Amino acid sequence: EDRVVSNLRAVGVKVWEKDPETGKQIRFTECGGHFALSLDGVGEGFKESDTPHTLEFKTMNEKNFKAMKNLGCKKSKPIYWAQCQIGMHLSELDWCYFFAVNKNTDEMYGERIKLNKAEAKLLVSKAENIVFSALPPSKLHEDPSNWQCKFCSYFAVCHGCKIPEVSCRTCSHVTPEKDGTWTCAKGKPVETCSEHLYIPQIMPKDFVVVDAGDDFVEYEDQDTGEVIRNQGNSQEIFDGRMK
């Protein structure tokens, strides 16, 4: 990032890497603070426009870099494009300068991305729905062979047998509040504890609920016939399935 910033300054772009009020990275929050995004900086003085741009820097392998050059950010890396859109929306700027470096050859690629207000608002709304939802979002596709699912980081959780890590967000007792805090129905400090109870809807599809109460859920593993009782022992009984 330092080299990229130096290169931008060398061609006359004024770059702010830190928030002048805090001295830290420029950061924005939504959803009461549950959702946050940081910028790599803000630049002003690009030859195409004097208006300030958010800055987003990425390094890529050869394959991803070639796709970026050929297709552009939105088509080759839609998740990066979405990040740029949210950054512009939260910072109230209309342009982003997206910069990528091929980590194998040091070749560079730059692209100006324009704010799409409707898309940006939709992305933030989607984040809010996920943050405050009591249940995990539905699968993008029911067919695990779909290409979007095959390349998703959560494929093993969504379509396979992997169980998410033990955390307050995967616990039935915990609720994210609108003011950015968390509430535990057990009256505990919001940190992983011995009373963790998985939200049943995030368990593997071969786990069928056969009994449940306020502080326990029993599952039958359809593959083995084993009955597993989740009652404050999530880490112990599911540890092997989290890997």
Q: Residues of each region from the PLM?
A:
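Metal-dependent nuclease catalytic cores that hydrolyze phosphodiester bonds in DNA/RNA
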Residues: 1-54, 61-63, 68-71, 194-197, ...
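Generic beta-sheet signal
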Residues: 18, 57, 99-101
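Metal-dependent nuclease catalytic regions and adjoining charged, substrate-binding loops involved
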Residues: 67-81, 86-187, 192-243
